[in-house]
Amino acid sequence: MYRLAKTTCLVCMLLMLIPMNASAGIKGKKASRFDWTPVINAIIEVESEGDAKAVDKSGKSCGCMQITPLLVKECNRILDLRKSSKRYSMKDRFSVRKSKEMFLLYQSFYNPKNDVELAIRSWNGGINFTKRGTQKYYRKVMSKMK
């Protein structure tokens, strides 16, 4: 069990070193220069402590970034609007790489100015978040980025 936990932590740490930019899911689209890696890593730490197999109590949010079925559906809608044939499935929520791609796709659509605060708050409270409702989460994520 210890060996499995150690291996899982090592894999998650290695995956966190892969730089991410805001062009996920768009073939032929020039990558944004903004590096979301610190934000993504902090969200992963807050959401699941790096556990790619994490499932919340309700069973709806899954994976290292605790992605909901609604977010998968929204990512597929964005891909459809962009005339992409790529689609995400529910099981993709358990893939660290695909979870990061979904985050980047969501940000590229709803947060084109790469506003870190907007990214963190909307990841927790949805696109219609309230500052009050996301304040605790925002502070947690920001503390992990320092």
Range-by-range predicted roles:
Residues 22-24:
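Boundary at the C-terminal end of the N-terminal hydrophobic targeting segment
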Residues 34-51, 67, 103, 118-126:
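Short, functionally critical alpha-helical segments immediately adjacent to catalytic or ligand/cofactor-binding
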Residues 1-9:
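Bacterial N-terminal signal peptides that target proteins for export
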Residues 9-19:
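Bacterial N-terminal signal peptides
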Residues 27-30:
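Non-transmembrane "mature" sequence context
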Residues 39-81:
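Secreted/periplasmic proteins that engage bacterial cell-wall peptidoglycan
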Residues 32-36, 58-60, 113-116:
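Extracellular/periplasmic catalytic domains that process cell-envelope and extracellular macromolecules
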Residues 69-130, 135-146:
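Alpha-helical segment that forms one wall of the substrate-binding/catalytic cleft
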